[in-house]
């Protein structure tokens, strides 16, 4: 019995021990789970997150430190601040309240910085405006960058001597945090431009990869403009003068000539010793070649960079012996200026209608830039605004085209010439060997000659884009009686060239009409046959700023009696764009046009432009032209023209575009003529 009682007691004790052990294990497990939960809670608790250093400093500067629980803690001082409600014209400047302005009067004329919610700063100048301190230069950029509108509430706090923080509150009374990128003009510094020039002593210059990419892009653009084949595009020919020769061409006189697409020429630099010994070398140190066949033989060779010590013999080219080149002893400067034109004659780069052999007896124009021929320029490209688009382009400082040699009467039927290339002013590619004739000759012309075109105000856009005016070549319009025999045969060439110019101008009109669309074609009224015109004269135009040189009409008595009208624009008779409009009621100050006007380079297609209208009395009137999808016409200035010309409702006005380079119209009133 005693043994049986002991056994249950032992089991009971073991059971109690096991229960105590389980309880302890449960307590330990619960403690571990609580620790894990606390750790997770610390990580996910948003109140435990810490702000970055910049945000903390900015918050402390604006709102101050958090108040401590101790009563002895010093209260945080409030920053000086003021607010402004955006009303009225606030975009240009903003007035600072007078009580706050008194504290910063010593900062007048200095710059302060406005800092937004993201820490970006804008520099603004303080200035006095009507005895009131205001934010001036730079405030407009801050308003535009943050898109501040009328009715918004701005709070300015001065956190430093010249730094203000700005809080923007929208109309909804909530703070608006506008994220704006830093302006490019503030973050980027202007890089100094690299000066480029010709290397001295034929030294090689290192070219970066960026320059190579830019040159390739420019080359592709030139190929698209001039329709050149990239495979036929060669490097320009350079004329190098030996450093050991007596005359040394300056860097500014060295010209780069565009070689023909199907030829490449080699430029050879000749040592000074060989140049002095051999009489076949000219004063420039270049070996002369008697015929052009030697140049064609060297077309397979490429441009070679020469060294002074090399003794290889490569074919070279220079100016022909028969060309009119001045000696270096008399006029060295003119000889340097004559070389580029002579190279043009030798390479055959003139117009296709002009023969190369005629270039041998040509005189070269002084002080003329021949890097790119004028008539070969594309007048529709972007950079065409850099040249003058008027007759003044052909009038240089020299006595090449003297204005006193021409007549000054509008109805003159003859052309007065001094034998010094008046044909260059007309852009007619006629060549002549009569260069020594300095006498005044009269050429009778009538207004009934077919193909002849009268000239008073030259329109450069009417010149053919692929024609090179032989500047420096003595082109003259021959006289049947006074001119020599070798000039008489060129009479027919003039008429044929004028017909070609008119045909090209007429074809360009058709291309413009196809671009305008069927809507504009239906509204356009223009004559298909060119008017009969006469070759008159060219006089020096004094063009005022803002007024283009417009063509003038012959309003003589013979015209009023039924005579034919004489157009005075070069090759614009077939290219003139005309349309007729019936005069609206006198109380209508605007005038709607039936078609859109052409778009000038560097101008928007739909915008406002100032045009110049010329009435029958040769008075110029500026009008404001507006082009929108729904309206196309004059919105200002037409009322004055209608009133001064006594136009009545129902009269017909004929508008004619006189120049494509500058928008200028001429108003013709048939009822008044």
Swiss-Prot record:
Residues 1-44, 315-337 are annotated as: Disordered. Residues 79-172, 576-671 bind DNA. Its main location: nucleus. Residues 1-34, 328-337 have a biased composition (Basic and acidic residues). SUPFAM superfamilies: DNA-binding pseudobarrel domain. Pfam families: B3 (PF02362). It comes from the Eukaryota. It is found in: Nucleus. GO terms for cellular component: nucleus. InterPro entries: B3_DNA-bd, DNA-bd_pseudobarrel_sf, REM_fam. CDD domains: B3_DNA. One of its GO terms (molecular function) is DNA binding. Keywords: DNA-binding, Nucleus, Repeat, Transcription, Transcription regulation. Coiled coil: none annotated. PANTHER family: B3 DOMAIN-CONTAINING PROTEIN OS01G0905400, B3 DOMAIN-CONTAINING PROTEIN REM-LIKE 3-RELATED. This is B3 domain-containing protein Os01g0905400.
